């Protein structure tokens, strides 16, 4: 196993009925993801964790709590990226102080930096932390697409060790994997792209669906890396309907609803996102029961 691992769960953030951070349920969920769903690592305060609506205090509470309670059994990756280099540096320093194992840095959003700006942004942060870094490219959300050349330049920096790639650009993914020759981990940035990314030499996935089908996803990855691509594909086809059903609305609305229904209480999403309707929840649950029948 390399770097952060192969199956990384982008953990949702549990809230109570008042919409506040539910610390006990955060720990409970993290333990389930590691002990029952076979997650090698957890990303905290990412897109799935509703980072835009978490305060800095809530993020640090989450980082420290999960690192203390679960960090002995899984890598804890703190989502510290933002559209401000200064704020990213400040949160990264605090995350390092509480003991996280690595950080995930999304490309700065809204202000649309150039490729040169992106390189300077990430290099500046890498030079001021000892933590290993996963870059996160998700242009549909950020408005900026990190180019192949920028990624390859950044991969030369010692503590930039991985990429979560959610652009769907498989040509870019193939070229980055080929050029870095096994020295840089590339992860599928969404569950639906897991098989093509593995086929190109990718390490694994930063997953949303693994909250409920982590064991299946880990089995797929293990089968593929054991040169049993037929088994991996067959397993993937079984869970594919549930993976696509999670795309019915903006992430993390569907997965939070599914976890509430089939695993444990994690509360509602925070505005400006809103929960699934009863009809949407019923449809999602039917797909889940049908495609993941043993649960």
From Swiss-Prot:
PANTHER family: 4-HYDROXY-2-OXOGLUTARATE ALDOLASE, MITOCHONDRIAL (PTHR12128:SF66), DIHYDRODIPICOLINATE SYNTHASE (PTHR12128)
Feature type site, description Part of a proton relay during catalysis: 47, 110
InterPro entries: Aldolase_TIM, DapA, DapA-like, Schiff_base-form_aldolases_AS, Schiff_base-form_aldolases_CS
Active-site positions on this chain: 136 (proton donor/acceptor), 164 (schiff-base intermediate with substrate)
Domain of life where this protein originates: Bacteria
Subcellular location: Cytoplasm
GO molecular function, a single term: 4-hydroxy-tetrahydrodipicolinate synthase activity
Residues at which pyruvate binds: 48, 206
GO biological process terms held by the UniProt record: diaminopimelate biosynthetic process; lysine biosynthetic process via diaminopimelate
SMART domains recorded: DHDPS (SM01130)
Enzyme class: lyase
Species this chain originates from: Natranaerobius thermophilus (strain ATCC BAA-1301 / DSM 18059 / JW/NM-WN-LF)
Reaction(s) catalysed (UniProt annotation): L-aspartate 4-semialdehyde + pyruvate = (2S,4S)-4-hydroxy-2,3,4,5-tetrahydrodipicolinate + H2O + H(+)
EC number from the UniProt entry: 4.3.3.7
Protein name per UniProt: 4-hydroxy-tetrahydrodipicolinate synthase
Assembly with partners or alone: Homotetramer; dimer of dimers.
Family matches, as Pfam families: DHDPS
Keywords: Amino-acid biosynthesis, Cytoplasm, Diaminopimelate biosynthesis, Lyase, Lysine biosynthesis, Schiff base
Function field: Catalyzes the condensation of (S)-aspartate-beta-semialdehyde [(S)-ASA] and pyruvate to 4-hydroxy-tetrahydrodipicolinate (HTPA).
